């Protein structure tokens, strides 16, 4: 089941499943515009034998915005370490997708004593060809569009972005798009 815990002045949404005595919990970090639900399939497979911790990163899912509005990678790394501390996890296997991958590898680089294993799934953080960036992200980089998107976000744009990041288009169901869209509308999640 979901729960909220206090981390860095935020009420952080997470799911902590599997055996609590697992010596190496698996911590899963989602990508941009996503939520802990990104990892539903992984958690279902892993949680019978492993402690699996999934979290909605600040400004995504049900966690909401950071009080200081600092969304730098360094701030996300500090958040991950604070989360591990709050959950009394001294060492973990850390996995990240997209933005979560960039956060994971930076956490492993700056806090190697906290990350014994690292899994990167289509991690962000390296140079991309402009044409490989989904249209939603390209538009969000434009100052005027970014400002408008804080108030208006067409569902079709969300659907297009989700389709661009899923390897199997058949997995992009209307329900999945609705979840991405609905969570993107949460106050502070488009800052």
Where are these regions (language model features)?
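Conserved alpha/beta-hydrolase "nucleophile elbow" surrounding the catalytic nucleophile
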Residues: 30-32, 92, 96-101, 105
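Active-site loop/oxyanion-hole signature of alpha/beta-hydrolase fold enzymes
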Residues: 3-17, 57-99
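Structural signature of beta-strand start/N-cap positions in the alpha/beta core
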Residues: 13, 25, 49-51, 88-93, ...
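Short, hydrophobic alpha-helix immediately C-terminal to the catalytic nucleophile
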Residues: 40, 81, 105-109
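Conserved HGGG/HGGXW glycine-rich cap/lid loop of the alpha/beta-hydrolase fold
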Residues: 10-11, 16-62
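Conserved alpha/beta-hydrolase catalytic His-Asp/Glu region
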Residues: 12, 131-135, 150-191
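Flexible "cap/lid" loop of the alpha/beta hydrolase fold
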Residues: 66, 105, 109, 116-148
